[in-house]
Amino acid sequence: MMRKLTKKDHEQVFAYLKEEAALNLFIIGDIEAFGYDTDFQELWGVFKENGTLKSILLRFHDSFIPYSKEDFVTTDYEALLSAYKPLKLSGKSTIVEKFETAPSLRLGVKNEMYFCECLNDNNLPDTPIHETIKLASLDDIERIMKLRSDIAEFPTTNESEKILRQAIETNTGRTYYIEKDGVIIASTSTSAENSLSAMVVGVCTHPNYRGNGYASLILQKMIQDFTKEGRTLCLFYNNPAAGRIYKRLGFKDIGMWTMYR
């Protein structure tokens, strides 16, 4: 049976999602930040006859994330999703790719990435960080956006600044940076921060300063901070060279993540 989830279901929903906390980072983060009853966010669940959860679907604005611990049944949600064209869907690849064969759905453009997590700081080098790494405030947003706009492979949209500002204001994301002569030359952010984990996004270094290990130093600082807080860091990558850097610092692949946009 499928029905909308409410805050009365929270304990059961959270216990279900927590077993794969890293993969469910976005759903957990959105529930903690916005709850079950806003105009831009809804959750549905399919229950077995004995009352246990079989699967969950999150709507955040016009994007959807499905999740199940077992074999996902796409037909449970097809009628609900068929109204959205093209459908913006993302999630664990083994789940969302099942929707490709649903005749009533029109999916957006597909993008597949590696999903990895870092559980602790055991793999970090013993040498102390030799650069000053700062935590951004609202006053630094303009300089961070300037860095991003100077990087050809870093897509920035009108929404990017708004998202960065909202993350800092709501404590759902933070940005670390290194500056030289008042100019930010490298930065990395988190998004979807929740009680268990956070997603690493926006890893970037100005082209004139690459090859000095600045991004790695910022990531080391982030790993140290989140390990102290008892939280897991996660990230997506599709560039094998970047993947090697992340793995040296202790990130491990835990699956594939597919987005349709």
Each predicted region: which residue ranges?
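Short amphipathic alpha-helix that is part of the acyltransferase structural core
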Residues: 1-26, 120-158
